[in-house]
Amino acid sequence: MRLRISEAVVLFLLGAVAALIGDHSHVVTGTTVYHTDAVPFVWSSPFWFPILVGAATASLAELRLHLPAPRDGVTARQALGGVAAVVGTYVTTALVHAFPVVPVTALVCAAAAITWCVLGDGPGAACGVVIAVIGPAVEIALVQLGVFAYHPDSDGLFGVAPFLAPLYFAFGVVAALLGELAVARRPQLGPPVCDTVSRGPGAG
């Protein structure tokens, strides 16, 4: 494991909080409806939802550190911008869920592309692709199990919203960047100090 436990916990909590904000936006606007009350809820979400997203955040960050050439020049400012971009896009999907599917999906694709162009790299895109496949697949399975449903105007991808793929892609790019930042901010050990004294010619 490349992440330290403390770093993984921070990333888990960050992902969980962002998930709660986005999911609350989906629930209050009717983008999604949960059909279960058998488990405790945290705000508007069943307790397992922020756990899944938090775990995905830490896992994607860890994955990035196993891919080639993690960047050591990423900054907290970039990370803040990335998190804001993903949460903002997530909330935007809640506000436009009833609009025609093509412009909504194109809008989210554009936001995801900009996020990658500004903040990502090749391995970060790979992380984005991984979660862009896994995330919607998990949601499709949960919809088929009757756990929740998307609004009829937003369920064109096997029962889930087509905008999920680019939204998850942006999430993967930013989670990868967060992993790079976690390593880049670790205290750097300086070069060893030589404690020998140079002696002039003929010195005893």
Curated annotation (Swiss-Prot):
Coiled coil: none
Homology family: Belongs to the INSIG family.
Name of the protein: INSIG protein homolog
Compartments, record wording: Membrane
Annotated binding of a 1,2-diacyl-sn-glycerol, by residue: H26, Y150
GO cellular component assignments: membrane
Function: Diacylglycerol-binding protein.
Entry keywords, A to Z: Lipid-binding, Membrane, Transmembrane, Transmembrane helix
Main location: membrane
A single MF term (Gene Ontology): identical protein binding
Topological type in the membrane: Multi-pass membrane protein
Domain comment in the entry: The KxHxx motif mediates association with the coatomer complex.
Cysteine pairs bridged by disulfides in the record: none
Transmembrane segments: 5-27, 47-64, 76-97, 101-118, 124-145, 162-179
Subunit architecture: Homotrimer.
